[in-house]
């Protein structure tokens, strides 16, 4: 191993004999721009192998992958590539999708060249340009080295390795073309297939997730340390969350220590600076804890990829607005061991449920996840009337009564939908009956309020013989047959 403070000329002298056939300017550029800690992380022979991989990079070959099997059924996967926005997340997602447990990782990024190129720490949606001149000199590069092992029941034979290499190349090419969303969707689809095979009962919350920040060790980066149990797809989900929040990973190290996973991220803000605001650090800490616990429950979701995507948006909604109130609510949520698998099932249930309902009801979601178990799926009309009356009694105007009525309706619909999704034993007829009973009470109360308003304006409606005019509201179709469901509009 070379010392982290070794002179660059000394490093060049050591590596040159090991890099026969590699142009001197390629070797010099690589040594000059790589992170100093990189050279102490690997023996000279391995460093030379990385240089040779970097020398193969071209506009049509922006990524080179090497996979070596080691003792005990472990594999070392080395990825040398041009640097792209969301690249680390894409790589971690693919490794998880192939059923590989990441036991150790060393992630390094080279410095900018004299003419800056777009990268992890640049505009999230850059206009890609082809490298000019000699390949390997004009763009930042990454060297990501993972030690992995297949999870129980998973194989990683030669054919699997070839498939991973090909798919990594395709995903990196998509990033090169600026097709970030397409790359993420393809990774998500593969992740779904893998996580679906790991469906198991939820084992409760993880033990304490320890997170610390340090701004004293590095001159350029905030160091974020996370110590916890390993969870499926955490690195993928967390790296995506950081990227979407304009927090960039310049370097990362992770390994198993005393049976716990230790992740160390070297991070910067979108301007390439340390994160110094205590509020930003607290929000990042909360984001990491929520994602860590959520990915632990992810195999409960009907559609894990959909759940991950919705959870990231849900997290933004919870934390926006009053930051202090949002944090307080979210920390309380973290402490409830029963809510994460329920949230995973809800967010992974359907696009309709998230887009049309959960997004609008996010403020009520956390309390409802805790309280829903206390109420039955089907409430009697008498019970619903009593609860609705309590919700409306303080409303003094027609507009206030209408708002209270709609709020009660939305909360009850949410409760019924949630009970049906998270409790597999509930039957469709019972689900439909619960919605139909609610609809009866809502329509009845709407009639009472409208009748009171119109009577006040025009008096009671009467027939030509002066007797009160009777009328009825008839429910046809699914309402009349008590077969209402998710698409029914009340």
Regions flagged by a language model, labelled:
Residues 1-490:
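Non-catalytic regulatory/linker segments of enzymes
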């Amino acid at each position: 191993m070379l010392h982290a403070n070794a002179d660059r000329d000394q490093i060049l002298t050591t590596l040159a004999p090991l890099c026969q056939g590699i142009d001197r300017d390629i070797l010099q550029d690589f040594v000059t721009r790589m992170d100093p800690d990189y050279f102490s992380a690997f023996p000279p022979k391995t460093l030379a192998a990385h240089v040779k991989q970097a020398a193969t990079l071209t506009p049509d070959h922006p990524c080179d992958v090497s996979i070596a099997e080691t003792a005990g059924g472990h594999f070392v996967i080395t990825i040398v590539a041009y640097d792209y926005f969301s690249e680390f997340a894409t790589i971690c997602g693919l490794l998880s999708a192939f059923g590989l447990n990441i036991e150790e990782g060393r992630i390094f990024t080279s410095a900018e060249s004299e003419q800056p190129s777009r990268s992890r720490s640049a505009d999230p949606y850059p206009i890609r340009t082809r490298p000019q001149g000699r390949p390997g000199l004009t763009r930042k590069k990454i060297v990501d080295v993972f030690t992995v092992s297949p999870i129980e029941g998973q194989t990683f034979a030669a054919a699997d390795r070839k498939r991973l290499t090909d798919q990594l190349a395709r995903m990196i090419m998509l990033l090169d073309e600026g097709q970030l969303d397409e790359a993420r969707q393809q990774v998500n689809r593969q992740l779904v297939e893998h996580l679906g095979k790991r469906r198991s009962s939820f084992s409760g919350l993880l033990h304490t997730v320890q997170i610390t920040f340090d701004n004293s060790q590095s001159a350029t980066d905030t160091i974020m340390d996370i110590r916890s149990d390993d969870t499926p797809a955490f690195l993928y989900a967390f790296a995506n969350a950081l990227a979407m929040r304009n927090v960039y990973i310049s370097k990362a190290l992770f390994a198993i220590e005393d049976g716990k996973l230790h992740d160390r991220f070297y991070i910067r803000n979108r301007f390439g600076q340390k994160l110094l605001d205590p509020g930003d650090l607290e929000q990042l800490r909360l984001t990491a804890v929520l994602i860590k616990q959520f990915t632990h429950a992810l195999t409960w979701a009907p559609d894990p990829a959909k759940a991950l995507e919705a959870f990231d948006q849900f997290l933004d909604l919870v934390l926006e607005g009053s930051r202090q109130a949002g944090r307080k609510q979210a920390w309380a949520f973290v402490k409830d061991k029963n809510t994460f698998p329920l949230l995973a099932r809800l967010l992974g249930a359907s696009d309709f449920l998230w887009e049309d309902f959960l997004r609008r009801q996010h403020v009520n979601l956390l309390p409802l996840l805790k309280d829903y178990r206390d109420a039955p799926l089907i409430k009697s009309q008498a019970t619903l009337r009593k609860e609705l009356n309590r919700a409306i009694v303080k409303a003094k105007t027609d507009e206030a009564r209408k708002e209270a009525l709609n709020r009660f309706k939305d909360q009850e619909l949410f409760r019924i939908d949630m009970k049906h999704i998270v409790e597999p034993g509930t039957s469709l007829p019972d689900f439909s009956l619960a919605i139909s009973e609610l609809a009866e009470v809502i329509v009845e109360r709407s009639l009472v309020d409208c009748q009171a308003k119109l009577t006040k304006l025009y008096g009671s409606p009467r027939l030509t013989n002066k007797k009160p005019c009777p009328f009825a509201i008839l429910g046809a179709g699914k309402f009349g047959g008590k077969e209402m469901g998710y698409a029914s509009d009340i």
